[in-house]
């Protein structure tokens, strides 16, 4: 991937893991609020000590109001300015999540064309689906960083920023005078997050990295699909993993800066992020052991756990993970209690080993019922189940509707539906600001930072 003509390195967040971080960030925001009451009576040094959360709070404009009426100043990262040298997915997904929490994102784009991710498709009112998903609530600043005037403008903005997120080729920022060691000397409180395919060191440092290539390098394709037919993820999972990792580390770095007063450098690798997500398959194959078998949409080692045909209405997903559930399933769903005594299915390992025979038994029973009837019966018996949804089913999902998870964001092509950030305590306490046009905020940003053109 290329950013401003350079190399691209392009995120599902664990709500539970981020909840503690968000509470800590809210606490830090409260510190800022208390420090404001003392600001006028402090020297600049005293004020900096009090205002440990944001480097640039005194340069901040009034909190913006999004289309739903929520003040971004109420959110945990209000007061944090992030400069983003980003394209594709990993960087933009990282910074969009920061924006969701109230951070100000100044997205640097190529004049005229902007982020190349704007042009991958035109599926959303003529806009790219990838770009729409990852770039709401941002300001677009079009700069040609090959021109000294524009590079100087960026450096001036960085002097008042809290975080720099970039996914240029390793070494590119150093050539522009924007390497971490240089920035550290000039702006010791600045947090710099570098996202790349393989990291800033090692033999793969300069190797091109696209999402599917990282899926392959990380072994992901070896555990998806069916034997002889490896399958990639249907989403940009390696990019998302890297964006998620960057997001989490930036939150931690902001909290750490509140303790030490110092910025830091984060070196996020797509490969390392994806390797972390390989979870049990990686440990399954430890010490030279055989990896888990490829099992399509089924679980590799637990059975029955996967999709099953019915008599009509499509497949159903079901799963069970203990002997109590297996007994209920045999008695109440299959009406075959004797199966619990069948030596072929005596435990999870044997059921997995003999899954072909067990599948035949299950689908023979299900063949007399419609999918909805099977799901209702499973639900009544307390057996975990799910519909095998497509994207239309997701848009219409009754649970998302019941929890008021949909909103609209403004864009250059009008209002676009969007999913609210996962994990918001109150559905009204979310930020859903517009998706910007290329260079839409140039004039306002130049004026704010006193940049002459």
Task: Say what each PLM segment does.
Residues 243-263, 276-289, 330-336:
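Oxidoreductase and adenylate-handling cofactor-binding alpha/beta cores
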Residues 304-381, 385:
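Aromatic-enriched alpha-helical interface/lid elements that frame and gate functional surfaces
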Residues 112, 198-199, 270-275, 312-314, ...:
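Glycine-rich beta-alpha junction loops
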Residues 380-429:
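A glycine-rich dinucleotide-binding beta-alpha-beta segment and adjacent secondary-structure elements
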């Amino acid at each position: 991937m290329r950013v401003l003509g350079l190399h691209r390195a392009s995120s599902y967040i664990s709500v539970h893991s981020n909840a503690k971080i968000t509470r800590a960030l809210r606490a830090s925001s409260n510190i800022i609020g208390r420090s404001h009451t003392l600001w006028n009576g402090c020297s600049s040094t005293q004020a900096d000590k009090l205002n440990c959360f944001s480097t640039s709070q005194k340069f901040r404009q009034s909190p913006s109001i999004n289309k739903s009426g929520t003040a971004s100043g109420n959110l945990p990262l209000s007061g944090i300015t992030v400069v983003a040298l980003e394209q594709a997915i990993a960087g933009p997904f990282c910074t969009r999540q920061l924006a969701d929490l109230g951070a100000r994102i100044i997205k640097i784009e190529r004049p005229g064309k902007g982020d190349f991710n704007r042009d991958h498709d035109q599926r959303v009112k003529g806009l790219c689906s990838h770009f729409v998903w990852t770039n709401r609530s941002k300001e677009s600043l079009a700069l040609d960083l090959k021109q000294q005037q524009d590079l100087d403008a960026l450096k001036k903005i960085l002097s008042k920023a809290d975080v720099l997120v970039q996914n240029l080729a390793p070494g590119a920022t150093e050539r522009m005078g924007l390497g971490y060691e240089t920035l550290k000397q000039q702006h010791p409180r600045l947090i710099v997050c570098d996202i790349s395919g393989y990291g800033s060191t090692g033999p793969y440092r300069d190797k091109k990295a696209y999402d599917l290539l990282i899926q392959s390098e990380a072994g992901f394709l070896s555990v998806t699909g069916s034997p002889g037919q490896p399958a990639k993820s249907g989403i940009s999972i390696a990019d998302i993993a890297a964006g998620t990792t960057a997001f989490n580390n930036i939150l931690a770095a902001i909290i750490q800066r509140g303790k030490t007063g110092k910025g830091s450098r984060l070196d996020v690798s797509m490969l390392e992020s994806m390797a972390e997500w390989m979870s049990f398959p990686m440990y399954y194959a430890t010490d030279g052991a055989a990896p888990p078998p490829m099992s399509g949409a089924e679980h590799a080692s637990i059975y029955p756990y996967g999709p099953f045909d019915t008599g009509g209405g499509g497949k159903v997903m079901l799963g069970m993970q203990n002997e109590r559930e297996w007994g209920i399933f045999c008695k109440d769903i299959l009406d075959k209690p004797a199966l619990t005594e069948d030596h072929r299915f005596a435990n999870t390992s044997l059921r997995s080993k003999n899954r072909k025979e067990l599948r035949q038994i299950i689908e023979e029973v299900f063949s007399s019922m419609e999918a909805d009837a099977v799901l209702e019966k499973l639900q009544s018996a307390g057996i975990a189940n799910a519909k095998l949804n497509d994207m239309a089913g997701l848009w219409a999902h009754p649970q998302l509707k019941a929890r008021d998870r949909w909103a609209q964001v403004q864009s250059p092509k009008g209002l676009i539906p969007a999913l609210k950030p996962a994990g918001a305590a109150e559905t009204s306490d979310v930020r859903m600001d517009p998706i910007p046009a290329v260079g839409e905020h140039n004039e306002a940003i130049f004026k704010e930072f006193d940049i002459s053109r």
